[in-house]
Amino acid sequence: TEGPYFYVPMVNTTGIVRSPYEYPQYYLVNPAAYAVLGAYMFFLIILGFPINFLTLYVTLEHKKLRTPLNYILLNLAVADLFMVIGGFTTTMYSSMHGYFVLGRLGCNLEGFSATLGGMISLWSLAVLAIERWVVVCKPISNFRFGENHAIMGVSLTWTMALACTVPPLVGWSRYIPEGMQCSCGIDYYTRAEGFNNESFVLYMFFCHFMVPLIIIFFCYGRLLCAVKEAAAAQQESETTQRAEREVTRMVILMVIGYLVCWLPYASVAWFIFTHQGSEFGPLFMTIPAFFAKSSSIYNPVIYICMNKQFRNCMITTLFCGKNPFEGEEEGASSTKTEASSASSVSPA
């Protein structure tokens, strides 16, 4: 059922469909589902906010973390905080009422904040892949990665994210309640006159999903080849082989993390867009959104907590200046000094 600035995934044959800005949507799913949604958002908030805020705090506290190669990781933490503060809190609050209680303006603000955080995060992963490829594979001779390059990378993520999130605010597509009608996102559902949703969805799918995906696969593919070549040149070195395995594991985790986060959401959004008019339940879009929102937790785990330097500094901060595991960390890392080119992207 399509209305002004909303689309409810239910045929209004019985006349029970109401505006998701004004009335509870308990006719869509069991009211218990809204309680589950609220509990899940609360879970993401109590885990996502501390770990991402701690990343920023630890970086301010430890000067050795403030290096150009870590700028993009901090940007990733900021993006996740955008999602937590601007998106998860409002979704949790709305789910407690069973509909989007913040109105049309609130929908625009929530949709913009959550999508902005998601897009910054997505492009940060692509820029991170480029940076690691450039540093390890050295496609440009005599190139030295510096602060200006890091700032350019961070600026690119914000530019691309804003290029995706601002247009719906000014008339190219729009933000509407989606799924269980407690959070807002891009309108994949309708061909509302005057909004040019078709062209925007095509632009978003190819420029803001396929392009980062191609970048990530290319850069990490080249990086793996470089690491394997380095390991093949030192076959007798056990430390080099171990470093190769760790880099391979890290790359696999990065690619899987990206796909788990964005592939379900992008695939379902594309299906809805290409099958407009077909019947689908509210959970059809809600569940893939869970995967995308969960990135605020597993992104910092994969990209930050698995980074030895960040991990040690976090532990030191949490234990008031002492690292009770320092002996174990040193013992585990002392065998990795030979494979410098591989360990430069190693997670531990």
Swiss-Prot record:
Its main location: membrane. Residues 59-70, 131-149, 222-249, 306-348 are cytoplasmic. Residues 327-348 are annotated as: Disordered. The record marks E110 as: Plays an important role in the conformation switch to the active conformation. GO terms for cellular component: membrane; photoreceptor disc membrane; plasma membrane. It comes from Neoniphon argenteus. The chain crosses the membrane at residues 34-58, 71-93, 108-130, 150-170, 200-221, 250-271, 284-305. PROSITE patterns: G_PROTEIN_RECEP_F1_1 (PS00237), G_PROTEIN_RECEP_F1_2 (PS50262), OPSIN (PS00238). GO terms for molecular function: 11-cis retinal binding; G protein-coupled photoreceptor activity. This is Rhodopsin. The modification N6-(retinylidene)lysine is found at K293. A lipid is attached at C320 (S-palmitoyl cysteine). A motif ('Ionic lock' involved in activated form stabilization) lies at residues 131-133. It is found in: Membrane; Cell projection, Cilium, Photoreceptor outer segment. Residues 332-348 have a biased composition (Low complexity).
